[in-house]
């Protein structure tokens, strides 16, 4: 029998696929990084399952997460999204998506890519943590606090240290798969 992290909701195929094919895999594509950063910002105060179930609708609402297109969305376009029942209709989170796209573009201009900026925080190598049980893992770390502080300084929204740690785990900068999970680095 396949051994996954115990947080995976086995009743939801999207959850299983997300864990098996995406979560914790080192990611270097800026557009994919932007999408996952946005998803983590939407999660604030909600369950990950809620966000995952609305993922496709968010992609459609935000131009497939094409960063430039999102950065150029008008207030009217964003206001119209508040009428879309397929997404999380939180005004602050919707407007934060545009603000984060704009901040993302500034980082790309400065570093050549968001990927280069992000991976510089871990010297290009995934941090592999010893995780016996995810429920005993910290909600934030020194790394997530440092990155969250820098992102905030650069104009990002909804990127506190808890959301940032979830993002770092999702995009493979931090491997927090449980030790007995088949997807754990070196397992």
Residue ranges of predicted features:
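HhH-family (HhH-GPD) DNA N-glycosylase catalytic core used in base-excision repair
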Residues: 1-187
């Amino acid at each position: 029998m396949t051994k996954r992290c115990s947080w995976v909701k086995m009743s939801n195929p999207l959850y299983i696929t997300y864990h098996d094919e995406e979560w914790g895999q080192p990611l270097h594509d800026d557009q994919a990084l932007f999408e996952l950063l946005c998803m983590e910002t939407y999660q604030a105060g909600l369950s990950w399952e809620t966000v995952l179930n609305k993922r496709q609708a968010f992609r459609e609402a935000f131009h497939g997460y094409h960063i430039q297109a999102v950065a150029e969305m008008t207030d009217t376009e964003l206001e119209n999204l508040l009428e879309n029942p397929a997404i999380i209709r939180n005004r602050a989170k919707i407007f934060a998506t545009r603000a984060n796209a704009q901040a993302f573009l500034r980082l790309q201009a400065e570093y050549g890519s968001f990927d280069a900026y992000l991976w510089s925080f871990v010297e290009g190598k995934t941090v592999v943590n010893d995780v016996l049980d995810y429920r005993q893992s910290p909600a934030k770390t020194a790394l997530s606090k440092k990155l969250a502080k820098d992102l905030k300084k650069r104009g990002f929204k909804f990127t506190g240290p808890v959301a940032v740690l979830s993002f770092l785990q999702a995009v493979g900068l931090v491997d927090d798969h449980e030790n007995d999970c088949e997807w754990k680095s070196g397992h």
